[in-house]
């Protein structure tokens, strides 16, 4: 896998929103983004459901608190305690109802004005399963034995309609995985109290 510098342009924003506190990273994988966050001086609480990914992340970013847990389990942060949550390509494995519930739980751990920065599979991500697979529900397909959701801008707007203010929504392409991966990059703040 190639290095993906996507977080670099966001670091000043993340540092400001974190306000000296920890960043929670959902689905940290092997810890590449974890290491980037640490290098920017941000304390990190990260988790992934795959034990081998957690082991790799702990080796790459030993200063971070990294746990093995499922995104559907309770988060390792108290309600209203965080200024930033990062979720790069980790929110797309679930039904629409589960996805909404996860996003609501992310909102609950953020303080008012806190930032969620996420990347989501885009509906035109042809190399990684957006078309030609059995549908489970609209925008959710069974790809190689695993459910994968592919978002369009309308779905993102609906997902973050209640209790969020979208600051940035843009299509992007990552070259981390060998072939171009189409995705949506979303930054939104927790609105209200």
What residue spans do the PLM features occupy?
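Class I (Rossmann-like) S-adenosyl-L-methionine-dependent methyltransferase catalytic domain
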Residues: 1-24, 29-78, 101, 115-193
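Short catalytic micro-motifs in class I SAM-dependent methyltransferases
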Residues: 89-93
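Short, conserved catalytic or interaction motifs in soluble domains
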Residues: 96
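A short glycine-rich, Lys/Arg-flanked "PGG" loop and its adjoining helix->strand segment in the class I
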Residues: 100-112
